[in-house]
From Swiss-Prot:
Allows the formation of correctly charged Asn-tRNA(Asn) or Gln-tRNA(Gln) through the transamidation of misacylated Asp-tRNA(Asn) or Glu-tRNA(Gln) in organisms which lack either or both of asparaginyl-tRNA or glutaminyl-tRNA synthetases. The reaction takes place in the presence of glutamine and ATP through an activated phospho-Asp-tRNA(Asn) or phospho-Glu-tRNA(Gln). InterPro entries: Asn/Gln-tRNA_amidoTrfase_suB/E, Asn/Gln-tRNA_Trfase_suB/E_cat, Asn/Gln_amidotransferase, Asn/Gln_tRNA_amidoTrase-B-like, GatB, GatB_C_1, GatB_Yqey_C_2, Gln-tRNA_amidoTrfase_suB_CS. Heterotrimer of A, B and C subunits. This is Aspartyl/glutamyl-tRNA(Asn/Gln) amidotransferase subunit B. HAMAP family: GatB. Its EC number is 6.3.5.-. GO terms for biological process: glutaminyl-tRNAGln biosynthesis via transamidation; translation. The lineage of its organism: Bacteria, Bacillati, Cyanobacteriota, Cyanophyceae, Synechococcales. It catalyses: L-glutamyl-tRNA(Gln) + L-glutamine + ATP + H2O = L-glutaminyl-tRNA(Gln) + L-glutamate + ADP + phosphate + H(+); L-aspartyl-tRNA(Asn) + L-glutamine + ATP + H2O = L-asparaginyl-tRNA(Asn) + L-glutamate + ADP + phosphate + 2 H(+). Belongs to the GatB/GatE family. GatB subfamily. One of its GO terms (molecular function) is ATP binding. NCBIfam families: gatB, PRK05477.1-2, PRK05477.1-4. Keywords: ATP-binding, Ligase, Nucleotide-binding, Protein biosynthesis.
Length: 491
């Protein structure tokens, strides 16, 4: 009996283009502002006019090196720029200044948490082949079609041309669409933590191209690689990979050839479609750019930049779980954006319990910030004020119900939770004698329910707890109230 063939396996790598958040472009002082009128941020260097010379923006080099360090890449002591030759309307010089065989950084990795549907969350280490600097191209707007073919005419906006990019090339270590999406998400998270890019996919600040093939099991040679473009969300990356995996497997099983090509993800139709044949490196005729000198980063400069790196999200996640006792879920949510993590840490530093603080921040406070499109810096309810509220709850001074009642006002105006509680008499009733008197009144008012409870209907204790909370406006100490009720009901 013939052995069963190994299961199909996808092999996926990502090329992630990160727009570096410098005020001026990579080789000129022209502005990088987004959303302005077309062709208002151009100059002779951007347009490649005769006699112009590019000069490397040193902030671009700093951001690229810091990004590379955060991705555990080895920084090259010497690297250079190359000209990548191709002809397209959005490329004014008819070549792109990039880095080919001597990039600024090589051989790194990041660790990602992957939550596949129906499976336990797992950690995966993804290799990174290189990071190199290059200039962005302009943008084409096609009339009558979403692509050049089929359009009646095209307009070119060169505002984006010359904006600095860091291209991050992963190794082919990804195996599912979910892994690809999580990897891209972690790259964006790291870049935002560093402050080198806003990572806004809708504005094109972060763009991902997927290279994908399938093969029969992990020991089989790689299949024919297909590149996918036009994915503007992490969800689109996952869905495009999943569709393409199925398409390629079906093609192999039906004898249809897979060609090396570039395909576009069609979000509306939820499929990939052929765009053009894929070029190889030789098609671009790379050669060193004669107008730009070699790039040298000294050991002292590297170490100075390394000392400025913040604590990165993966390190924070581990610390929150291991040192603060948070769940993996809470640690992940809190570290997704650096401002939220900074807010949380300020609350804990002010003396609040970490788990209670995490619950309030990831719940009501995050909902308020998101629905009102606020930054944490703009939030009137400052970390030390939230810490005060958490301490009131933790110390039994107020109930969670009371905290929820005063929270909307605090979120809108800020202020001292303790002052509000004292001024309005909202403190928790924790005096046993006072609670006993209230319980006696309550039992006297409900003799039938007391008789039913003593006859075996123990669930009625919940009724009495509810009535007690109603009578006290939610201010009764729940633990003490239950103890007194239990004792009184049993007679």
């Amino acid at each position: 009996m013939a052995a069963a063939e190994p299961a199909w396996e996808a092999v996926i790598g990502l090329e992630t283009h990160v727009q570096l958040g410098t005020d001026s472009k990579i080789f000129t002082a022209a502005s990088t502002a987004f959303g302005d009128d077309p062709n208002t941020h151009i100059d002779p260097v951007v347009c490649g006019l005769p006699g112009t010379l590019p000069v490397l923006n040193q902030k671009v080099l700093e951001y690229a090196v810091k990004a590379a360090m955060a991705l555990n890449l080895n920084i090259a002591e010497h690297s250079k720029f190359d000209r990548k030759q191709y002809f397209y309307p959005d490329l004014p010089k008819n070549y792109q200044i990039s880095q080919y065989d001597e990039p600024i950084a090589e051989e790194g990795w990041i660790e990602v948490e992957v939550a596949e549907k129906g499976k336990d969350t797992y950690l995966k280490k993804i290799g990174i082949e290189r990071l190199h600097m290059e200039e962005d191209a302009g943008k084409l707007v096609h009339a009558g079609s979403d692509r050049l073919a089929g359009s009646t005419h095209s307009l070119v906006d060169y505002n984006r041309a010359g904006v600095a990019l860091a291209e991050i090339v992963s190794k082919p270590d990804l195996r599912t669409g979910r892994e690809a999406a999580e990897y891209a998400s972690e790259i964006r998270r790291i870049m935002r933590y560093l402050g080198v890019s806003d990572g806004n996919m809708q504005e094109g600040s972060l763009r991902c191209d997927v290279n994908i093939s399938v093969r029969r099991g992990p020991d089989a040679p790689f299949g024919t690689k297909v590149e996918i473009k036009n994915m503007n969300s992490f969800s689109a990356i996952q869905k495009a990979c999943e569709y393409e995996i199925k398409r390629q497997i079906k093609a192999y099983e039906t004898g249809e050839p897979i060609v090396q090509e570039t395909r576009l993800w069609d979000e509306g139709k939820q499929l990939t479609k052929s765009m053009r044949s894929k070029e190889g490196a030789s098609d671009y005729r790379y050669f060193p750019d004669p107008d730009l000198g070699p790039i040298e980063v000294s050991v002292d400069q590297r170490e100075a930049w390394r000392s400025e790196l913040p604590e990165l999200p993966a390190v924070k996640r581990h610390r929150y779980a291991d040192d603060l006792g948070l769940s993996q879920y809470d640690a992940r949510v809190l570290t997704d954006e650096r401002p939220m993590a900074d807010y949380f840490e300020a609350v804990v530093a002010a003396g609040a319990d970490a788990k209670l603080s995490a619950n309030w921040i990831t719940g009501d406070i995050a909902a308020h910030v998101n629905s009102n499109r606020l930054s944490y810096a703009e939030l009137p309810f400052r970390p030390e004020q939230l810490a005060e509220m958490v301490q009131l709850i933790d110390g039994g001074k107020i109930s969670g119900k009371i905290a929820k009642e005063i929270l909307p006002e605090l979120l809108e105006k800020g202020g001292s939770p303790k002052a509000i509680v004292d001024e309005r008499g909202l403190g928790m009733i924790s005096d046993p004698a006072a609670l006993q008197a209230i319980v006696d009144e309550l039992l006297a008012a409900h003799p039938d329910e007391v008789k039913a409870f003593r006859g075996g209907k123990n669930k009625l204790q919940g009724f009495f707890v509810g009535q007690l909370m109603k009578k006290t406006g939610g201010k009764a100490d729940p633990k003490l109230a239950n103890q007194i009720l239990s004792k009184k009901l049993k007679g």
